[in-house]
Amino acid sequence: MQTPWRSPTRSTVAVNGRLPEHEAFRRRELRFHRYAYWFVNGVHVSIRLGKDDKLCLLVVIGVREDGTKELLAVEDGYRESTDSWSAVMRDLKARGANEPVLVLGDGALGTWAALRDVFPAARRQACWVHAIANVLDCLPKRLQPRAQTMLHEIMEAPTRADAALALERLRDELEAKDPKAIAKLDRDWKHLTAFYDFPAEHWRHLQTSNVIESSFATVKLRTRVTKGAGSKTAALAMAYKLLDAAQERWRRFNDHHLVADGLAGARFKDGIRVTDDDNDDNEMTDEKVAA
C-alpha cells in the first residue's frame, strides 16, 4: 500500500534539504534499461516563495525497451534555458542513460539546443497539441473551428505525403487570411512529421506530450491548494512525489515489442517497417528510372 504524500518536515528531509527518496531517485543508475523515446517538458508552477514565486520543473520521461514509461528526471531549471536542460541531460548520460532514438517536447528552444549538444543523434518530434494551439491563437475565432478540423486531418494523415497535401489544403484556405498561422507549421514541419519514421502503432503516443501535461496538471493543482511549499527544494520534492505516484497510471506503449526493434536500428517509412527486400526493390526502381 502506497504511503500518502505528506509535506516534508525536518525529520524527513535530507541534510541538503531533499527528501531521502528524491535524493536516491536523482542518484540511481540508469544503465540497466535502454530508452527508445523521451518525453521532455518544462512547466512553471506557482509556489509561495516571496520574490522568487515560480518553480520551473524540468521533467524527462523515458520509454523502456518493454514499452513501459519511466520517470527519469524531475529538476528545477531557470526558464527552460539551454544550460538548465544541458545539466539535466548530462546528468542522465553520466548515470548510464543511452541516447534516445526520438525526443518529444513542446518546442522550447533551450530543450533542443541542449539535446543537440548532449545527444546529437537523437531525433526531435514536436508536440501536435501545442502546434495546433499555436496556429489557432493566430486566427480569429470565426475561423478556428474549421482550421482545427483541418489541422487534425494533417496530424492524422496516414502518410507523410498525405500530410503534406492536407497542409497545402489548409494553406489555400488560410494563408491569405493569416500567413503567420501557416508559417508556424512550415517552420516546424520536419519535426512535426518525424513520427512517420516510427511504428504506426506508436503514433498515438508520439504525437503529443500529454503524458507530461496531464501529470503536471496534478502538480499545479496541488501547489495551488497548499499554503505554500516554503522553499524551492521542498516544492521540488512535492512535485517528485506526485509525479512518482502518477507513473503507476501511465499507459504502456502499444505493440511494445516494436520499441526494442527501434532500439536495434529497425527503419520505418510511414509507420511500416522497411526490410532489405524493400531496399532492393527501391534500388531496382531507381535504376529503371535512370535508364
Residue ranges and their predicted role:
Residues P120-C138:
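Inter-helix linker motif
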Residues A133-T159:
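Conserved phosphate-handling catalytic cores of large alpha/beta enzymes
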Residues T9-N16, P20, D83-R90, A94, ...:
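Solvent-exposed alpha-helical segments within well-ordered globular domains of core cellular machineries
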Residues W5-P8, T12-G105, L109, A113-A114, ...:
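RNase H-like nuclease fold core
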